[in-house]
Every structure is written in structure tokens, then in C-alpha cells.
Amino acid sequence: FIQKVKEPHLHELLLSFFGDKEFVKNFCQHSAAKSVHHGFIGGLLEHTLSVTKICDFFCTLYPMINRDLLLTAAMFHDIGKVNELSDFPENDYTDDGQLLGHIVMGVEMIGSHIREIPGFPPVLASELKHCILAHHGEFEYGSPKKPAIIEAAALNFADNADAKLEIMKEQLASATPGEWIGFNRLMDSNIK
């Protein structure tokens, strides 16, 4: 998906992370969560790719979306998790993960790289950071901001859809087909 991003500053920003072999190795080995969804080795990569694919699809339906901004935000939305969670087999919250969380940590990481790119447009930087800050959608879900631009809303919807469907997939994988599994507090529903 990096090659789809044509805006030169966003493209360079993506390469500053995903062109770094050590970062990519770490990113590919991390989970997306301790236990909620994609809580396995490679879960962060799988979740990120799924969210990015959903966002790319949204762009075909809603042409007013800035595709370069949304795809970049999708690829970066959980980037802070490489520092929020420790490596396997521990896969537990780090001190910074407990104190700051992946959203704040991700925005800090992105901001640090943006400062190294000459002429990075300030409005574009703010819009990208906003997408990351708002990707959980609601304050009660840990989002410091609610989505204020269409790209942030689309990212929130894609992230939520993939996380919830993965929860369902994981629950259904261990169930007898056609049988009720029982109440899932994250879905707030009985699942079949």
C-alpha cells in the first residue's frame, strides 16, 4: 500500500518507518493487543493490513476522502503498539504503555519523524496526527479526540470493524458450529 501513497511527504514518512529493517521486524512480530483482538505474533501486521484494505475500499465509495492521508493513517494507526506492548512471550504492557498508551506514543513517534522531513506541510501533519488521536472514536474508548475530519471517521470505522470481526472470528473458531457461545462483554452480546 505504500506505493499507492503519492503525496511525497507522506510517502517519505512511510518509508522512514517501513524502510527500516529493524522496525519492520519488530512491527511484524508484535501483537495488536494483549488479549482483546489480534493478540498473537503477527497480529499487529494482520490488523494493520486489514484496516488499510478497508480504508482503501472506503476511498472507492467516497471520493471526497483524501486517499493518501487515510492510507497513511491506517498504516500508522497502531504504530505505538510496538512500544506499548513488550515482545513475546511476555506480550504485556510496558511502563510507557501503561502511562501513555499506544495512541500518544504513536503520535510522538510520527511527530519525531515528521520533524526530520524538510517542508512537511503543517496542516497535513496535524490532520495525520488527528487521525491517529481519534482512531478509537470515543473518549470512553481511550481516544483523546473524536473524529473531526472524514479520514479520521473512516479510520475509526475500519479499525472498529476489523477489531470486532476478529473477536467474533476468534470466538467462533473455538465453538461448536450453530451453538450459542455465550455472552461476550466486548461485543456486549450473546454470540452464535
Residue ranges and their predicted role:
Residues F1-G97, P122, E138:
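Acidic/His-rich, divalent-metal-binding segments that scaffold phosphate/diphosphate chemistry
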Residues F1-V5, L13-F17, C131, F157, ...:
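Residues that form generic nucleotide/phosphate-binding pockets
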Residues F57-S174:
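Divalent metal-dependent catalytic cores for phosphoryl transfer on phosphate-bearing substrates
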Residues L165-K169, S174, G178-L186, K192:
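Extended, charge-rich intrinsically disordered regulatory tails
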